[in-house]
Amino acid sequence: MNYTGYLLAFQLCIILGSSSCYCQADLFKEKYKLRNIFNASDSDVADGGLFLDILKNWKEESDKKIIQSQIVSVYFKIFDNLKDNQIIQKSMATIKEDLIAKFFNSSSSKLNDFPQKLIRTPVNDLKVQRKAVNELFKVMNXDLSPKSNLRKRKRSQSTFHGRRASI
């Protein structure tokens, strides 16, 4: 890469970095705006956490991601409940956009999996029950868990380590 290419790459990094700083500043501003509107720093909300107490019990990173996505879904329910409040609409939209990007990789299909597909599963429907029982062993089996892939990877690596090339 020549000098001009390095200069253009550097400028691109500066532009991208400054735009993300601007977005973070805007996000903090909207959070504090909501905090002030709801008087969320008052002593009546200081009697214990709502979600943080739950989150403290989850230690593993993958477990935390699961519970955080559940908590984010609750925030979205709260935002939907307040959607008619014009004063906080921009703040909620900004925060919701950031949450979708962070926890659902900006994927609307992932966002809708939990609240629309899982929670609203008609558990009294016989066909649903039959499908659930049919999939039960696949869900519980190591086929879908990350640990099974790790075991397979370790197993395949150990077979390669056991073989030595003869000269």
From Swiss-Prot:
It is found in: Secreted. It comes from the Eukaryota. One of its GO terms (cellular component) is extracellular space. Gene3D superfamilies: 1.20.1250.10. SUPFAM superfamilies: 4-helical cytokines. Residues 1-23 form the signal peptide. The keyword Ribosomal protein does not apply. Glycans are attached at N39, N105. Residues 149-167 have a biased composition (Basic residues). Keywords: Antiviral defense, Cytokine, Glycoprotein, Growth regulation, Pyrrolidone carboxylic acid, Secreted, Signal. Type II interferon produced by immune cells such as T-cells and NK cells that plays crucial roles in antimicrobial, antiviral, and antitumor responses by activating effector immune cells and enhancing antigen presentation. Primarily signals through the JAK-STAT pathway after interaction with its receptor IFNGR1 to affect gene regulation. Upon IFNG binding, IFNGR1 intracellular domain opens out to allow association of downstream signaling components JAK2, JAK1 and STAT1, leading to STAT1 activation, nuclear translocation and transcription of IFNG-regulated genes. This is Interferon gamma. It comes from Dasypus novemcinctus. The gene is IFNG.
